[in-house]
Amino acid sequence: MRFDVVTLFPDMFGLVRDQGVTGRAHAQGLWALHAWNPRDFTHDVHRTVDDRPYGGGPGMVMMAAPLEAAVAAAQAARAAQGLQAAPVILLSPAGRRYDQAEATTLAAGTGAIFICGRYEGVDQRFIERCVTHELSLGDFVLSGGELAALAMMDAAVRLLPGVLNDGDSALQDSFNAALDGLLDSPHYTRPEVYEGVPVPQPLLSGHHANIARWRREQSLRLTASRRPELIERARGEGRLSKADERFLASLAGERES
């Protein structure tokens, strides 16, 4: 797994390369990260990567040529390692929203090249010539694509075999297929009683079936309350059992009473 990032701020990516579980995995060689600054692919004394937009308007637009040259260099470096050409992902508010399914797809491949835009955006001709995918974190605007790329890489890398100490941890994450796309249940650790609030009794029982059922019901309760559309999706995909449906019906009864 190799990620390449085209960015004006390569130092930002030390966060995912050097810190936490992704940093440890990088040190172990489970994935690689290479940053490419488009300023290194300019030919003027000022290393210009942006200019005013045609037609007028506020802000500046990133120029196509430095970006395309950076992508070409990244693809060539991948080819030299025997890797196939990577998808080129532009972080953009016009992109498809990134979710756990996208992270799983990304983790199953050999990596990607992320394009981190700045200013008002990037020249459309670069998008048409080089970009294969556009992705977004959500309906809000960031100062650049770097934070979005960091989040997307983190979500994908933690799914790689050997990255997490407990291989089952990722399977129990919210939105994961092992949870049928639902939110995860609440978690508790020591002490057994904190400020007068005890750990729920089922978690102390040692009865694995009861613990599993309690966690499933809490997952259903939380998802129905916070993200009801995920319940409908799971239902439409046939992921809810009869016991799940009975519990959800009881929740509806609680709300009505």
UniProtKB/Swiss-Prot annotation:
HAMAP family reported for this sequence: TrmD
Class of enzymatic activity (EC top level): transferase
Protein name: tRNA (guanine-N(1)-)-methyltransferase
Family designation: Belongs to the RNA methyltransferase TrmD family.
Claim: RNA-binding is one of the keywords in the record: no
Assigned EC number: 2.1.1.228
Organism domain of life: Bacteria
One Gene Ontology cellular component annotation held by this UniProt entry: cytosol
Sorted UniProt keywords: Cytoplasm, Methyltransferase, S-adenosyl-L-methionine, Transferase, tRNA processing
UniProt xrefs under InterPro entries: Alpha/beta_knot_MTases, tRNA_m1G_MeTrfase_C_sf, tRNA_m1G_MeTrfase_TrmD, tRNA_m1G_MTases_N, tRNA_MeTrfase_TRMD/TRM10
Any Pfam family matching the protein: tRNA_m1G_MT
Biological function: Specifically methylates guanosine-37 in various tRNAs.
Catalyzed reaction equations: guanosine(37) in tRNA + S-adenosyl-L-methionine = N(1)-methylguanosine(37) in tRNA + S-adenosyl-L-homocysteine + H(+)
Phylogenetic lineage: Bacteria, Pseudomonadati, Pseudomonadota, Betaproteobacteria, Burkholderiales
